[in-house]
Amino acid sequence: AMDELWSSKAPVSCIHPGWESLSGREDVVESWRSIIRGGAPAIRCREPEVFLYGNTATVLCYEEVEGDFLIATNVFVREAAAWKMVHHQAGPTRGKPQDDPASEENPQVN
C-alpha cells in the first residue's frame, strides 16, 4: 500500500519524528516498510486541512497515535488520475484536535 501512495515520477522526501531527513523514493518507501514491519501502532488522521494549488496539494492534520498527537504535513502531486505523496513530515505538537465526532470517521493511515 505504501508503494502505491508515493509518487514514482516526482522526487520524494520524508521526515519521521526523531529521524533524519530521507530523500529518494527507495529510502522513503523502505522506511515506511520498516515502521510497519515493526508492529507500528494505528495512526489516525484527524482534522485534515487541504490546500489545493493546481496539480499540487498540501494536507495539514493531526496524527493520533495511541492517544498522543503529532502534527503532520503531507504534500501530494497529481499523476495522471491519482494524487501521489511527495513529502511527509510529522512531529510533536502541544495542540490536539477538538473532539469532533465526525473525525472518528477519518480513515486510518496504516
What annotation goes with each model-predicted range?
Residues 1-2:
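Solenoid-repeat scaffolds in large eukaryotic assemblies
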